[in-house]
């Protein structure tokens, strides 16, 4: 037995591989996207999984195997989470994705690695602890539950050919834990041998001669495989949003002065005018104020934090980009926009003829119904720089509901 490995079990370095590169065909991926990014309880499935792992005091680096086409979805889902969470491009199979994520952890040199399905969001700290404590120098551990259903063997045309005894049968779960070096080498050996038919990491360990110990699993630790699984998970988490919703209101303000030009852009609509607004991007004061209001609801700073005026890539950019970025951030946190209100303050141009077009633009950007959006206009009664027609100001308010209660 390796003494350093065992002498202080509480100080062993633990890393996690989260496998989340699948396409989710069985859960209706074609219509609704990969299941790990489907919303349950107002947040992506993978977000729930990562929140539990990131909060664990035993877990260090988390390497998440992500499909290359899902990088943006993953970044939105993990936004705001603390800890060393790394995205790794996955492969064509679960086994290949796991091997690539393990390779990414080589530089971390963990003592133990937990390998977990990204679509098992209902893990808990106690389960993580049981698996870690059961891992030895040269042996792994996996959570499992005794098989309780009667098992039948089927033959041709679905005719039962026998009943399988349940004695000694267990349904495996994740996270499955292993000493890092042995399981990584086992994955490498399987890859080099052309073996890609293993259904979990414990099977690879067994094939490589690594013993694996069973620990008590959790009935709650279900894998979301089918569309109905996701619907049931959403129902399970739904009350957190409906019983004591966390309602947040954010405000935003922006102002830009006029310069030479022939039009202004307000709330995404181009309006003919004898001057243009000068400033960041297309200087859409309405959308800039709205972006700040949305960011305020999730404590994500302001527009300048995400899109610095000094960065030349945003020169002349459409401000719609900023609003959609803020919407993605709050939705990654489970936010649902209830209302957005923009007040434009100017002597000219007239806003009334363009109000309906503005409402349609905002509704599309925010992905909410037009009834939840408001655009108003007022003058400054001839007072100040606005009254002198030197510029336009905007005030915006956003109301967003987040999962959980005010106590969270």
Swiss-Prot record:
It comes from the Bacteria. Residues 248-408 are annotated as: 2-C-methyl-D-erythritol 2,4-cyclodiphosphate synthase. Its EC number is 2.7.7.60, 4.6.1.12. 4-CDP-2-C-methyl-D-erythritol 2-phosphate binds at residues 254-256, 280-281, 302-304, 378-381, 385, 388. It catalyses: 2-C-methyl-D-erythritol 4-phosphate + CTP + H(+) = 4-CDP-2-C-methyl-D-erythritol + diphosphate; 4-CDP-2-C-methyl-D-erythritol 2-phosphate = 2-C-methyl-D-erythritol 2,4-cyclic diphosphate + CMP. Its cofactor is a divalent metal cation. GO terms for biological process: isopentenyl diphosphate biosynthetic process, methylerythritol 4-phosphate pathway; terpenoid biosynthetic process. It holds the Pfam family IspD. The record marks 166, 223 as: Positions MEP for the nucleophilic attack. One of its GO terms (molecular function) is 2-C-methyl-D-erythritol 4-phosphate cytidylyltransferase activity. The record marks 26, 35, 280, 379 as: Transition state stabilizer. A divalent metal cation binds at residues 254, 256, 288. Keywords: Isoprene biosynthesis, Lyase, Metal-binding, Multifunctional enzyme, Nucleotidyltransferase, Transferase. Pathway: Isoprenoid biosynthesis; isopentenyl diphosphate biosynthesis via DXP pathway; isopentenyl diphosphate from 1-deoxy-D-xylulose 5-phosphate: step 2/6; Isoprenoid biosynthesis; isopentenyl diphosphate biosynthesis via DXP pathway; isopentenyl diphosphate from 1-deoxy-D-xylulose 5-phosphate: step 4/6. InterPro entries: IspD, IspD/F, IspD/TarI, ISPD_synthase_CS, MECDP_synthase, MECDP_synthase_CS, MECDP_synthase_sf, Nucleotide-diphossugar_trans. Residues 1-247 are annotated as: 2-C-methyl-D-erythritol 4-phosphate cytidylyltransferase. PANTHER family: 2-C-METHYL-D-ERYTHRITOL 2,4-CYCLODIPHOSPHATE SYNTHASE, CHLOROPLASTIC. NCBIfam families: ispD, ispF, PRK09382.1. Bifunctional enzyme that catalyzes the formation of 4-diphosphocytidyl-2-C-methyl-D-erythritol from CTP and 2-C-methyl-D-erythritol 4-phosphate (MEP) (IspD), and catalyzes the conversion of 4-diphosphocytidyl-2-C-methyl-D-erythritol 2-phosphate (CDP-ME2P) to 2-C-methyl-D-erythritol 2,4-cyclodiphosphate (ME-CPP) with a corresponding release of cytidine 5-monophosphate (CMP) (IspF). In the N-terminal section; belongs to the IspD/TarI cytidylyltransferase family. IspD subfamily. This is Bifunctional enzyme IspD/IspF. It comes from Chelativorans sp. (strain BNC1).
């Amino acid at each position: 037995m390796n003494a350093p490995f065992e002498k202080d079990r509480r100080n062993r370095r633990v890393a996690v591989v989260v496998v989340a590169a699948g396409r989710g065909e069985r859960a209706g991926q074609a219509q609704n996207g990969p299941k790990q990014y489907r919303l349950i309880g107002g947040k992506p499935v993978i977000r729930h999984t990562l929140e539990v792992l990131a909060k664990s005091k035993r877990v260090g680096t988390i390497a998440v195997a992500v499909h290359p086409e899902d990088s943006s979805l993953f970044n939105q889902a993990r936004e705001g989470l603390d800890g060393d969470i790394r995205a790794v491009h996955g492969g064509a199979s679960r086994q290949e994705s796991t091997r690539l994520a393990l390779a990414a952890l080589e530089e971390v040199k963990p003592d133990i690695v937990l390998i977990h399905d990204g679509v098992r969001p209902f893990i808990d700290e106690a389960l993580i602890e049981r698996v870690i404590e059961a891992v030895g120098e040269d042996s792994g551990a996996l959570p499992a539950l005794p098989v309780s259903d009667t098992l039948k063997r089927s033959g041709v045309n679905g005719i039962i050919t026998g009943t399988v005894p349940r004695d000694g049968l267990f349904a495996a779960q994740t996270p499955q834990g292993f000493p890092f070096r042995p399981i990584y080498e086992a994955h490498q050996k399987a890859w080099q041998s052309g073996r890609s038919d293993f259904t979990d990491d414990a099977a690879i360990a067994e094939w490589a001669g690594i013993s694996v110990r069973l620990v008590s699993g959790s009935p709650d630790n279900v894998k979301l495989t089918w569309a109905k699984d996701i619907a049931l998970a959403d129902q399970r988490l739904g009350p957190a949003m409906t019983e004591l919703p966390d309602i947040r209101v954010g405000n935003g303000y922006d102002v830009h002065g006029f310069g030479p030009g022939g039009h202004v852009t307000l709330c995404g609509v181009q309006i003919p005018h004898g001057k243009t607004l000068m400033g960041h991007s297309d200087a859409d004061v309405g959308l800039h104020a709205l972006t700040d209001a949305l960011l305020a609801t999730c404590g994500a700073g302001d527009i300048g934090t995400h899109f610095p005026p000094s960065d030349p890539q945003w020169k002349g950019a459409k401000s719609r980009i900023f609003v959609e970025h803020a919407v993605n951030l709050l939705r990654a946190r489970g936010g649902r926009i209830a209302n957005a209100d923009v007040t434009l303050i100017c002597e000219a141009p007239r806003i009334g003829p363009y109000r309906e077009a503005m409402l349609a633009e905002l509704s599309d950007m925010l992905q909410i119904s037009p009834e939840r959006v408001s655009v108003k206009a007022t003058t400054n009664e001839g007072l100040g720089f606005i009254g002198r027609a030197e510029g336009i100001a905007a005030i915006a308010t956003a109301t967003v509901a987040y999962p959980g209660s005010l106590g969270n």
